[in-house]
Amino acid sequence: MRYWMLPVALCACVTPTSSAPGPATGSDVNLVSAFPTGAASPIESGWLVAKTMQPRQGAHPPEQGSEALTQAPSAEPAAAPVVDVPEAPLSADGPALLAQQILSRPELAAYHGWIRYLEFRAAHASARFADQPGAVVEDRLRLAQWTRKILDNPNVLRELRGVTEWAYLSPVDGSGQPFKLNIPSDYDPAHPLPLSIELHGRSGNHLEDADMREHAGYFELSVLGRARAGSYRALSEADVLQVLDYVSQHWAVDRSRVHLVGGGMGGTGALWLASRYPQLFASGRTVCGSASDKPLGNLITVPIYALHSEDDYRVPVLHTRGPLAKLLALGGNVTLEEPNGYGHAVWKYEQGTARADAWFPQQVRPESREVKRLDFTALDGAAVRAYWAEIAEWGPEPKPAHFALKVGSKNRLEARLDNIRSLHLRLAEAPFDADQPLRVNIEGAPVLNVPAPLPAELWLEHVDSSWTAAESGPVAPFRLHTPGGANQLYDGEPLLIVYGTHGDAATQAALRVAAGAASRSSNASWPKPARDGGNDGVAYNQNLYGELNIKADVDVTPEDRAQRHLVLIGTAEQNSVVAALAARLPVRLEGDELAWNDGSRSSARDRALGLVHYNPDAPSRLIFWVASNDAAAYAAGSLAPELLGALPSGADAVVVRVSDPTLVASRSFDSRWRWLSRDQSALLPAELAASSADLARAVAAAVRRAAPADFALAGLPEPARTSAYEPGEARLADLLAQNYFTPVSVMTLLGSELVAAAHAIAPSDGVLEPELDLSRIQPQREYRLALSARQISPFVRLTHLAPRKYEVVEGDVARALSRYGVTGMPSVPAVANRATPPALATSR
């Protein structure tokens, strides 16, 4: 066991023994609209719903230094007169009528999500639990009991104590999304208490993974995140943030002591959320989680306590060992315990769990004015802020944006900015003396002098190759563009999926199928149902309590167009909403051609288009348009939504072949929605584009040179993004977009281990680059092997190798490709072995 106790958490991750009820299927389409405020929209039952939450415009903490961190919540459920409603019988109509009364009363808005959730459970219990009549009766009885309880006592929310299931009303679709909350026995609204947010593992849910018991001192919160396997990204991520807002609104939470904890997928999610919103969280405790694909500098203000068994082959220990060593080197606060013998069940390591549980209450999020150093990388437009600094406008390249800021003596700010056109500084929240001049030294630029008294806010702007300081930020008639792909529509704001109703019968059926697949996903991809699922028949990768809202194009209202992000399915001929926008979109489907507004044209035969763009009718909202003349493009698992929605992407448009999973081309915008030229990017050699194996070797060669390393791993992608690229059309830019922020690491292996690894990965089409020459490998010599974050898990599962000498290196796959390309791969001599980071310097 290795144990680092350094200046920097998790509780037990419980393996689920059963699965809870889940989302609607097929025909159960929810057409309710929760917007605008006070507006009511009918659904099948005729019930009404009112808006209770504002859409999230990024995740911001309460104002630093204000009483918001300590005062009792100001927006508890308002006292309301008890309605004299006759006792309703337990029937289909009785609870429904009482629920309708609650949902139609704005002063009972705090209960709308809970009622919506109970309605869903009651309505779908028979279909999901036909063989469990007791469960069916229980769900229906719970709706009847709670509607009566709320109408009899509108302040019942204030009186809840102990462990309870609850739900909030999601602004995404008006559904009730559940969570479990432990309200401490000593809770007093006048005295805010800490909050620990638990994120469940894959196959789990908010009820089963959180082993909550009544106690005093702090709140516990377990969040579903839309699906059992939502990975706490896209809508699953938004769910956590919106539940946090809801709980903080209705209970007195100390926002300076909000902690994340999770195991497996939940541990990975805890690190993901902490890296995206460091200003929100006081600590992170993770069991067998992965930090491999996280911007590690983002975590320097968030203490981390990690437990990971050395023999975990489901989520290999390398996913924490290397990244957390890198975080430590960056100045982070990290504790890592690596016992052995627990596999993926390291929550059974009682001593480590006890230490982590004792550690986290001591962690307090720093006040904004105490934070003198920030090192933040933004991957998309949903998470662009760290404490007092925020990206106001992206730079010109389709890659992540980064700022590194350090406050020095005498009101001096040292700044290193990459791919940023405008950086917003909240000086009133920063550690500067407002009565003294500010000197800003941006790397490579003349010093900027800001006279005293300092403004509350300042924007650093890059204009005409020079930096200036201004007291106002960028202005545009549309929402500014940010990279990241179609998941930016899945940020917690209102969302509507719109399918076309025009064309032949087969096309219309395909469009409806596509809408159904999209409605069951918590992100912009349209995945096929996972093979595994709960005892309710819901696949782990599908929304558990309600599909996303769907409408036919002919039913879309002006309010829908103005207030929602829109997923548009179909061509202008197939979808009338697309037809109304087509002339103002940057690409059009004209017969057998795609016409781009920069004058370029390309074939549309056997091809599908995916596009992310602002909505011309509502410039603050986004659209995600998927279109093809071939109905086969609208099947679940289609490549265009996969490429733009499964992971962050540098592409804003993709053209894919329909007949097989091949990427033809991708395109990206600058911050003002102007196409970046493809002509400046080199064509992929035809022989590489046509062969995924050869292309993988070429990518590995670039990674090996950049690391540097003796060998690099080729193949074993996880997940596979595409099988091939279109010869004669695909360019290096397409490869870069699909490797958007893919970190690289290097492990050190003995020659004997390297040979054994090569044999172990060969049956799975994994190879080493350059090819292993057994006659030249010395068994006891050390060799450096480079691999990407996506290759770690399959490599360790096949080889069972998790070497001590393992480090995350600077740069990523895209940077390696930008520097070395995929042509001309001269052999590079074996490199000298560099020293291992101090924290990892242990014997083999």
Go through each PLM region and give its residues.
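A domain-start/cap signature at the N-terminus of enzymes
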Residues: A80-L193
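Gly/Ser-rich "nucleophile elbow"/oxyanion-hole loop immediately N-terminal to the catalytic nucleophile
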Residues: S185-H191, R233-G264, R276-L280
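Short beta-strand element of the alpha/beta-hydrolase
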Residues: H191-R202
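Primarily recognizes the serine-hydrolase "nucleophile elbow" in alpha/beta-hydrolase
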Residues: S256-I300
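Short beta-strand/loop motif that positions the catalytic acidic residue
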Residues: A306-H308
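C-terminal catalytic histidine-bearing segment of alpha/beta-hydrolase fold enzymes
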Residues: Y313, L318-I420
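Solvent-exposed alpha-helical segments and adjacent loops
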Residues: E414, R426-E429, D435-Q680, V813, ...
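Solvent-exposed loop/linker segments at secondary-structure transitions
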Residues: D491-L496, G500-S525, V538-G546, A562, ...
